[in-house]
Amino acid sequence: FKTGDVLAIKFDDEYGICFVSSVDEGPRRLEYNLACTRLLQKEKPSIDDFLSSKIACGKQDTSYCLKTDCWFNHKDLGQLIDRFEKIGRVELEDYVLGTLAPASTLDDIYNQITLNKKTWNLKFKDTRELIKAFETDERTVVNDK
């Protein structure tokens, strides 16, 4: 996966959706940060579902500050690879990772998607606000918000 890839996630009875917020490569190390949206649904999500979803984030100066994260090493993410399907790619507005949450299972992703808004003092924005442009196999679109 590459930064900006939009991924549908297959849980047992429903789907979620996330994007790769960063890929960190170093000597003998490859790690992925996945930013999860609040979307859970029965059908496989589309890029339009992703754009219509909400994400935990705020503003930090002129950048968006993501408040959702699942931080996987290459080995752990590789064991779940059959649960992910790339459905598109996004170019994002400037952002920083405001949270780093180690993850190794599908439950870790599900827990990020369903974090309690009040307990964790989360604010949500329309995912579309963070997107400069997106592409699928069928089309490339610059977001006019």
Q: How should these model regions be labeled?
A:
Residues 3-4, 15, 31:
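Short, surface-exposed beta-edge/turn micro-motifs
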Residues 50-144:
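Beta-strand-rich cores of mature extracytoplasmic or soluble domains
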Residues 7-9, 20, 34:
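Hydrophobic beta-strand residues in large extracellular and virion-surface proteins
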Residues 1-11:
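Short coil-to-beta transition motif at edge beta-strands of beta-rich domains
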Residues 14-24:
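Short beta-strand-centered aromatic/proline hotspots
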Residues 22-48:
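Basic/aromatic-rich interaction segments and small domains that mediate binding to polyanionic partners
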